């Protein structure tokens, strides 16, 4: 294992994670800065809300692939070393997305990019994440709540994989997600958080006339 080679890999992984997908899609195709609309976030949820399902899907796929590509860089370049180094590369991508060098070290909440890291590292663990998150989203209609509850469950489940480094990285991701979702947590407590236009809770509120027009929460 070459320390210099891995250092370069980690830097490249950070730069890949820093790629501001939502901002670029907004500016190139809509001539607007997504940071000035909706929640102001550059990630998937705000992209769907502000730019529509096609652009939102593109942002989702690219942000997931950022995490996957960064995680698998050591494999792509045929570098030898412990498998946990893939997780470190993935963590660098998450840091890049959250603190992008291209956005003055600001960025998104890294939910999609974190999913991409799990996809690149352990397909079964990624499948577990999907099985936890998607039903949670369908039930609650809240992306933020689903993300926070899911990462806690996923962290607990990580112990069953007997991979201490996976558990450590998942724990760090959990802390980071809670920190990055501080404003969402406040809105959830105050019943002001926006919901997605599908799922059981959305359909319940719609059928009872309880839906409110989305506010531009910052």
Swiss-Prot record:
InterPro entries: G3P_acylTferase_PlsY. GO terms for molecular function: acyl-phosphate glycerol-3-phosphate acyltransferase activity. It comes from the Bacteria. It catalyses: an acyl phosphate + sn-glycerol 3-phosphate = a 1-acyl-sn-glycero-3-phosphate + phosphate. One of its GO terms (cellular component) is plasma membrane. One of its GO terms (biological process) is phospholipid biosynthetic process. Pathway: Lipid metabolism; phospholipid metabolism. The chain crosses the membrane at residues 6-26, 50-70, 85-105, 115-135, 159-179. Signal peptide: none annotated. Its EC number is 2.3.1.275. It is found in: Cell membrane. The keyword Cell membrane applies. Its main location: membrane. Belongs to the PlsY family. Catalyzes the transfer of an acyl group from acyl-phosphate (acyl-PO(4)) to glycerol-3-phosphate (G3P) to form lysophosphatidic acid (LPA). This enzyme utilizes acyl-phosphate as fatty acyl donor, but not acyl-CoA or acyl-ACP. This is Glycerol-3-phosphate acyltransferase 2. It comes from Lactobacillus johnsonii (strain CNCM I-12250 / La1 / NCC 533).
């Amino acid at each position: 294992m070459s320390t210099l080679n891995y250092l370069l890999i980690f830097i490249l992984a950070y730069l890949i994670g820093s790629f501001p997908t939502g901002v670029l899609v907004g500016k190139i195709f809509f001539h607007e800065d997504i940071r000035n609309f909706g929640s102001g976030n550059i990630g998937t949820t705000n992209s769907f809300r502000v730019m529509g399902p096609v652009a939102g899907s593109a942002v989702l796929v690219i942000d997931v692939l950022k995490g996957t590509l960064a995680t698998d860089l050591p494999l792509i370049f045929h570098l030898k070393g412990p498998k946990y180094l893939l997780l470190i590369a993935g963590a660098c991508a998450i840091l890049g997305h959250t603190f992008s060098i291209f956005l003055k070290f600001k960025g998104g909440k890294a939910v999609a990019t974190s999913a991409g890291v799990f996809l690149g590292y352990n397909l079964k663990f990624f499948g577990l994440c999907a099985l936890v998150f998607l039903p949670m989203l369908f039930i609650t209609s809240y992306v933020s709540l689903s993300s926070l509850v899911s990462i806690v469950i996923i962290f607990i489940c990580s112990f069953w994989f007997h991979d201490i480094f996976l558990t450590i990285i998942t724990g760090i991701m959990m802390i980071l997600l809670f920190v990055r979702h501080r404003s969402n947590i406040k809105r959830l407590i105050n019943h002001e958080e926006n919901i997605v236009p599908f799922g059981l809770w959305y359909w319940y509120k719609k059928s009872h006339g309880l839906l409110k027009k989305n506010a531009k929460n910052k």
